[in-house]
């Protein structure tokens, strides 16, 4: 089984939409193939695998929880210092997410795809 997230499916609500879009674009640089799932079927077939099943899981939350705290911290560490994004920008973003959480407006979602495969 192969599991991977297509980072183009990520929805992360923030008050500053322009900043959020920039952060998400810069974060994609962290991944060798941020959109791998949409290209994986032909790659697997070309490598001699049979794809038995493909399924998806929506990872979604309407409140800040440990998984999202981890993603937020890792994202902030990666994007700070890239493309003009400062540590202060990241702190403002984190504060915005916290405010949205406090007011019940927080929303995060991303799709993970599962490929059940066998050789031959």
Name the predicted role of every residue range.
Residues 2-64:
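Conserved catalytic/acceptor-binding region of the Class I
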Residues 33, 106-107:
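Aromatic-acidic/polar surface patches that form glycan- and anion
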Residues 40-41, 89-91, 109-113:
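Short coil/turn segments at secondary-structure boundaries
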Residues 47-50, 70-74, 108-120:
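Core SAM-dependent methyltransferase catalytic element
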Residues 51-106:
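C-terminal helical/coil "lid" or tail adjacent to the Rossmann-like core of SAM-dependent
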């Amino acid at each position: 089984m192969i599991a991977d997230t297509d980072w183009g499916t990520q929805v992360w609500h923030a008050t500053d939409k322009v900043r959020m879009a920039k952060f998400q674009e810069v974060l994609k640089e962290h991944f060798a193939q941020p959109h791998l799932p949409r290209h994986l079927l032909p790659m697997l077939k070309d490598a001699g695998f049979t794809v038995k099943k493909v399924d998806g899981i929506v990872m979604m939350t309407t409140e800040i929880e440990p998984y999202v705290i981890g993603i937020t911290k890792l994202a902030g560490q990666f994007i700070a210092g890239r493309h003009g994004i400062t540590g202060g920008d990241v702190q403002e973003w984190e504060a915005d997410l916290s405010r949205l959480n406090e007011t019940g407006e927080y929303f995060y979602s991303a799709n993970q795809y599962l490929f059940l495969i066998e050789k031959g």
